């Protein structure tokens, strides 16, 4: 383990990510697997890398994340928030840049609960006139 580690927690939908940033060459490891192997989608990889690319710190830090719960999209969002928070611990001067881009805001949108009498949150059973 590295001597200096910066920590950030990210949440999105039902996913929770614990992110550790340490000085390194820019490797991103998620649940002990490389980023490209874990997600397999370029769009999700881009989402995870956004805070690093915006601040120009992609090659300065190695990122290690443990993420659980939710789906892959929620997990990517949780890791993104965790990375942004860890970067602020590493360098508080990055805060205005990340804040302006909206990377420090926890996305409050959650799955709406199912109501009785309906099939899903809003989907009503099929209606027959006759």
UniProtKB/Swiss-Prot annotation:
Key words of the record: Ribonucleoprotein, Ribosomal protein
Compositional bias of kind Basic residues: 111-130
Annotated InterPro entries: Ribosomal_Su5_D2-typ_SF (IPR020568), Ribosomal_uS9 (IPR000754), Ribosomal_uS9_bac/plastid (IPR023035), Ribosomal_uS9_CS (IPR020574), Ribsml_uS5_D2-typ_fold_subgr (IPR014721)
Pfam families: Ribosomal_S9
Matching SUPFAM superfamilies: Ribosomal protein S5 domain 2-like
Domain of life: Bacteria
Keyword Chaperone attached: no
Transcription regulation is among the record's keywords: no
Gene3D superfamilies in the record: 3.30.230.10
Gene Ontology CC: one annotated term: cytosolic small ribosomal subunit
Family annotation (PROSITE patterns): RIBOSOMAL_S9
Residue ranges of the region described as Disordered: 105-130
GO biological process: translation
GO molecular function, one term: structural constituent of ribosome
Family, as annotated: Belongs to the universal ribosomal protein uS9 family.
Protein name: Small ribosomal subunit protein uS9
Organismal lineage: Bacteria, Bacillati, Bacillota, Clostridia, Eubacteriales
């Amino acid at each position: 383990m590295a001597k200096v580690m910066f920590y950030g927690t990210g949440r999105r939908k039902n996913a929770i990510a614990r992110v550790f940033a340490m000085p390194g060459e820019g490797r991103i490891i998620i649940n002990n697997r490389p980023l490209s192997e874990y997600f397999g989608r370029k769009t999700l990889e881009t989402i995870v890398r956004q805070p690093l690319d915006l601040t120009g710190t992609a090659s300065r830090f190695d990122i290690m994340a443990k993420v659980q719960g939710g789906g892959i999209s929620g997990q990517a969002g949780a890791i993104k928030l965790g990375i942004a928070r860890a970067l602020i611990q590493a360098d508080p001067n990055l805060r205005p840049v990340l804040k302006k881009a909206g990377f420090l805001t926890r996305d409050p949108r959650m799955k709406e609960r199912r109501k009785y009498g309906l099939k899903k949150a809003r989907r009503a059973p099929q209606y027959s006139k006759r």
